[in-house]
From Swiss-Prot:
GO terms under cellular component: chloroplast
Protein name (database record): Light-independent protochlorophyllide reductase subunit B
EC number: 1.3.7.7
Keyword Plastid set for record: yes
Ligand binding ([4Fe-4S] cluster): D36
Gene name in the database record: chlB
Amino acid sequence: MKLAYWMYSGPAHIGTLRVASSFKNVHAIMHAPLGDDYFNVMRSMLQRERDFTPVTASIVDRHVLARGSQEKVVDNITRKDKEDNPDLILLTPTCTSSILQEDLQNFVNQAELDLETDVILADVNHYRVNELQAADRTLEQITRHYIEKAKRQGQLDIQKSEKPTANILGVFTLGFHNQHDCRELKRLLNDLGIEVNEIIPEGAFVESLKNLPKAWFNLIPYREVGLMTAQYLKKEFNMPYISTTPMGIVDTATCVREICKTVASLRLSFGVDTPQKQLKETNISSTKVDLVLKVEENREAKPLNTSMEVLGESKLRFGPLTNFDVEKYIDQQTRFISQAAWFSRSVDCQNLTGKKAIVFGDATHAASMTKILTREMGLYVLCAGTYCKHDADWFREQVQGFCDSVLITDDHTEIGNIIAQYEPDCIFGTQMERHVGKRLDIPCGVISAPVHIQNFPLGYRPFLGYEGINQIADLVYNSFSLGMEEHLLEIFGGHDTKEVISDSLSTETGLEWTSEGLTELNKVPGFVRNKVKRNVEKFAQQQNISKISADVMYAAKEA
């Protein structure tokens, strides 16, 4: 436990509450002191949802310390059951309840005697896991509970759907553009002729968890949450899962190929690979089949329209998706739907070639962004990092060869010092890196949680799929400040004229700039002024000079 000015991953109970509040008609009760109940305010402010946050704090106060928690916790569970009639009440411990060594499982058992509602104690170790790990674990625990419950009641239907279907696991509240990504994933799956079976946990009911085995496969867009659930379903029902994040042109194409390959192999194993059998199941008219055969004869490449001719051929020919169909779809989407492919070859984007960047965020977004910047947009990534220390090995493997160095840390001062040391042209990180960039006057594009309210947009801004590629291209290009444009605006008194600000993370340098020194510094073009200022201050410190004049600037230049 440590006192921190900024945390990338919150305590474990925040992850549990994020999962619980993502489900519909699920109420969470946390046994915590005042101060730990900030989740309600945070979610209400950031998530921009109309519903109230379904979380109640069972406050640990002096009465609890004197008499024990059992009566208060059980009363809170019973009261919420009567008031809200939820499908599930999830009790989450906190660091405080762990310190007090409360037997919360006993409280849950006692409350269940008088209730018909399911009551679960979140099984997370608050001293060993962080917010994201706890969220992953809680989602798996709730899924396991309801699938085993359905097994006991004989209500578990593991019969696969007739048409290819998929579950999307890991979309939940306070995630980075998760709702927008989910819409884009549904569109992508629809293009491939795959229906969505369930989306867990965002907007789902716990009773629908028993339907998860009906799907053909699971799609996990983010490594942080959903992977444990997918592994559980793989172990119990032999359900394949795809964990490649479709972010960027290359990885989106890879994900599409994996999906089509998985569906093709499952079709063969399910025995739906013959035209006669599939024709009988889908009731496609002979007129439609004749139309498709004519389309197949003329396979000229052209932009896809709403009827999806290219994939329509593949689905209506009844066989598994062939590599030719998949590659044609990817080519059409890359050239006509995504604008990033041609934009990356344009003169505007070539201005970014060789620009230096630093990337930091959660493992999924930081790794994907590093690869996009390097191989798709021609930038030079000095350092790629993540605060997901538990996923460090996977992250290193993903970014190997795409950056100069790798940083695994949850200390914001470390990445801040790296940024100040390398002085990149742009930063791509979290809200904290945005603050650092403002202090150092380095532009920053936000690509990962934790973020503030401006990164919970009301408009449609996915980061996944082919539309997400367009959003990323805009973000990258708009994040960079064009040096000559800024310089010209300053020369002609444009709106970007600004005073020299302090650009070191430590403001107590003990140096004083004279008026003539500042005048000389202001003559330096804006896009290199900050670097010149830092170099002069560094020179002055080495020479034990306390006042920086124009002569000191000239001496630093000659040194």
